């Protein structure tokens, strides 16, 4: 398999690491990763006390909020989300082609 690579402005080989998962058990819902990502990959979602996703409206019982991946196809592999995350919630991997 071939791995997608690129070059930095300085000419060094760079392998983008694309977002795979967010550990929602570790996520504190601070939103730092959301602010760091300019590609609309992430969304902050509300969880009820049973750990189920619910609408973020006044009538719903919200236990906490966590980050979720809504558009993984928009990820450019920069890992800005992981660098901004204080709880190390992100898993990334290179893109491999057959």
Swiss-Prot record:
Pfam families documented for this protein: Fer4_7 (PF12838)
Binding site for [4Fe-4S] cluster 2: 75, 78, 81, 85
Biological processes, Gene Ontology terms: nitrogen fixation
Keyword Transferase: no
Residues that, per the record, bind [4Fe-4S] cluster 1: 27, 30, 33, 37
Cofactor binding note: Binds 2 [4Fe-4S] clusters.
Transmembrane domains' residue ranges: none
NCBIfam families: fdxN_nitrog
Protein name: Ferredoxin-3
């Amino acid at each position: 398999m071939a791995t997608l690579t690129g070059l930095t402005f300085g000419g060094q080989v760079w392998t983008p690491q694309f977002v795979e998962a967010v550990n929602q058990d570790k996520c504190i819902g601070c939103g730092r990763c959301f602010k760091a990502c300019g590609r609309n990959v992430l969304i902050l979602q509300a969880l009820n006390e049973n750990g189920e996703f619910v609408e973020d409206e006044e009538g719903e019982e919200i236990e906490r909020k966590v980050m979720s991946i809504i558009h993984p196809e928009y990820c450019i592999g920069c890992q800005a989300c992981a660098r901004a995350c204080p709880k190390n919630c992100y898993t990334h991997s290179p893109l491999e082609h057959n």
